[in-house]
Amino acid sequence: MTFSRPSGRTADQLRPVRIERAFTRHAEGSVLVSFGDTHVLCTASVENRVPNFLRGKGEGWVTAEYGMLPRSTHTRSDREAARGKQGGRTLEIQRLIGRALRACVDRNALGERTITLDCDVLQADGGTRTAAITGAYVALADAVNLLLKRGEIKKHPLIGAVAAVSVGIYRGEPVLDLDYPEDSDCDTDMNVVMNDGGGFIELQGTAEGHAFRRDELNALLALAEKGMGDLFALQRAALAG
């Protein structure tokens, strides 16, 4: 039996990825990133203050918030603000985004400033956290480039690019960049965050059905590395445009 994906993509093929910069007017950096039918708005906001634990140390901070619009999925969900607290999934994802982006920043070069990346899912079709990281990096780059242009910082604080992609085992086959039909029916789901030097920043992998073997893990990481090459090229092209 011939293996096929619901989307018709090959096992090592990303969804169509678009990165649109300067999507909003007020933020120092803003990007609409699309991985197929997953659309995430990422904005970077600069504030001349840092959390209390960093005051007087000459270091900056990079953090993130994440949320989904009520009708970003098939059925409406109440806003978390209406519930009075953020859910565990939201907290986990925004911490992941913050960790990923801090890994590419020289915080001493940033000075005592905070850059907050707000990642709002407009439409979800799988891979929202990986799309958010990939788009938020471009928004962050635009924000720090603006600080350099204004003369507010002297040294570029970015020490490399960061992107993320999902991989998984779907119907027994390792695949790249799962959409919702695959994500909801896969045996293994993994999110991979890397820098453009080939280093791994974070791996989040779970066997949803059958346990995965070491050779399957190696195949998933190889797929992720291939996808990262494409994503870093798209980020560079967007920032050069």
UniProtKB/Swiss-Prot annotation:
It comes from Xanthomonas oryzae pv. oryzae (strain PXO99A). It catalyses: tRNA(n+1) + phosphate = tRNA(n) + a ribonucleoside 5'-diphosphate. The keyword Lipoprotein does not apply. Belongs to the RNase PH family. Its EC number is 2.7.7.56. GO terms for molecular function: 3'-5'-RNA exonuclease activity; tRNA binding; tRNA nucleotidyltransferase activity. The lineage of its organism: Bacteria, Pseudomonadati, Pseudomonadota, Gammaproteobacteria, Lysobacterales. The keyword Metal-binding does not apply. It comes from the Bacteria. The gene is rph. Phosphorolytic 3'-5' exoribonuclease that plays an important role in tRNA 3'-end maturation. Removes nucleotide residues following the 3'-CCA terminus of tRNAs; can also add nucleotides to the ends of RNA molecules by using nucleoside diphosphates as substrates, but this may not be physiologically important. Probably plays a role in initiation of 16S rRNA degradation (leading to ribosome degradation) during starvation. CDD domains: RNase_PH_bact. Keywords: Nucleotidyltransferase, RNA-binding, rRNA processing, Transferase, tRNA processing, tRNA-binding. This is Ribonuclease PH. Homohexameric ring arranged as a trimer of dimers. InterPro entries: ExoRNase_PH_dom1, ExoRNase_PH_dom2, ExoRNase_PH_dom2_sf, PNPase/RNase_PH_dom_sf, Ribosomal_Su5_D2-typ_SF, RNase_PH, RNase_PH_bac-type, RNase_PH_CS. Phosphate binds at R89, G127, T128, R129. One of its GO terms (biological process) is tRNA processing. Disulfide bonds: none annotated.
